[in-house]
């Protein structure tokens, strides 16, 4: 039986991500989200999600080449998903700038039972529309893995001189259009709906049904009305609910999503139905 909701965007609130991969970035992100990150053990995280009847999609992380910071290994997420299989599923991550190593790791992610691959073009400093990276996306398609891309602005580096060297243009949604066109069998999820280029992403999703949008990283009550209009209407089958924990809490995101007062069938699609379909759950 499916849970009440599936949180499509959950980072590990543990030291390996917050103090390792995110070292030097957390303070700016906390200021951007106007909220302290909530640190947690995996035991406590699992209990938290059980208590609200939500499944969490845990995300690995690998931006070693661009940031010089350690990765969250795919094995860490796979182990957590096995240990807490009632409440966690997960995505691996590859560093696109590692070339053939990244391509090989896609197969390892699939073999580990993970459901997709997480990319952060701005932190990984790569342009998804550069065909040099397309063997990675072809491998995702071959193995039936979802490709989840950060899109739009980023709380990481926000409000800092030079944005801590992080380029937002790498995460502009239009860069995903040629990827989706060249890989029609690849399910692409554009996280955070690409603001401030959200209309660009809406156009892509209307044109290409293999492109989905997640609403994580946003207080639902602050989602732009043009995005909410498409969520209620033409794109209700391509939106995914998520929190971006530990920056925003699932409890808050659920409560504010409920307050949007969507039709029951649309709310169910966005909260769990669309995610369950592309994750092949239930």
Please describe what each predicted stretch is.
Residues 38-46, 72-78, 102-104, 173-176, ...:
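Alpha-helical scaffolding within the catalytic cores
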Residues 10, 60-61, 92-96, 119-121, ...:
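A cross-domain feature marking catalytic cores of carbohydrate-active enzymes
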Residues 55, 63-158, 167:
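Active-site gating/metal-coordination segments in enzymes
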Residues 115-116, 129-240:
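Catalytic pocket-lining loop regions of alpha/beta-barrel enzymes
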Residues 13-16, 63-66, 96-100, 153-157, ...:
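Active-site environment of divalent metal-dependent phosphoester hydrolases
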Residues 16-22, 70-71, 103-105, 159-162, ...:
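Short aromatic-enriched loop/helix-cap "lid" or pocket-rim segments at secondary-structure transitions
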Residues 9, 77, 81, 90, ...:
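Conserved, mostly hydrophobic/aromatic
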Residues 1-51, 55, 107-108, 235-240, ...:
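Mid-to-C-terminal alpha-helical segments outside catalytic/metal-binding sites
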């Amino acid at each position: 039986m499916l849970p009440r909701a599936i949180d499509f965007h959950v980072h590990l609130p543990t030291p390996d991500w917050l103090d390792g991969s995110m070292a030097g970035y957390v303070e700016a992100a906390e200021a951007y989200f106007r909220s302290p990150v909530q640190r947690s053990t995996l035991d406590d995280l699992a209990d938290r999600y059980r208590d609200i009847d939500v499944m969490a999609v845990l995300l690995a992380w690998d931006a070693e080449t661009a940031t010089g910071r350690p990765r969250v290994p795919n094995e860490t997420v796979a182990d957590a998903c096995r240990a807490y299989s009632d409440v966690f599923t997960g995505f691996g991550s590859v560093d696109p700038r590692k070339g053939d190593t990244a391509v090989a790791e896609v197969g390892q992610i699939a073999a580990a039972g993970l459901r997709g691959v997480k990319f952060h073009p701005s932190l990984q400093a790569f342009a998804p529309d550069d065909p040099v990276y397309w063997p990675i996306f072809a491998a995702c398609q071959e193995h039936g893995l979802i490709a989840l891309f950060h899109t739009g602005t980023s709380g990481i580096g926000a409000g800092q001189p030079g944005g801590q060297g992080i380029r937002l243009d790498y995460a502009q949604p239009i860069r995903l259009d040629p990827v989706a066109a060249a890989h029609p069998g690849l399910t692409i999820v554009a996280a955070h709906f690409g603001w401030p280029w959200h209309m660009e992403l809406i156009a892509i999703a209307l044109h290409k049904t293999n492109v989905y949008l997640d609403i994580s990283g946003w207080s639902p009550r602050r989602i732009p009305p043009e995005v909410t209009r498409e969520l209620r209407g033409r794109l209700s089958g391509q939106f995914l609910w998520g929190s971006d924990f530990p920056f925003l809490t699932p409890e808050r995101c659920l409560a504010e999503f409920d307050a949007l007062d969507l039709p029951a069938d649309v709310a169910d699609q966005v909260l769990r139905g669309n995610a369950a379909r592309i994750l092949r759950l239930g």
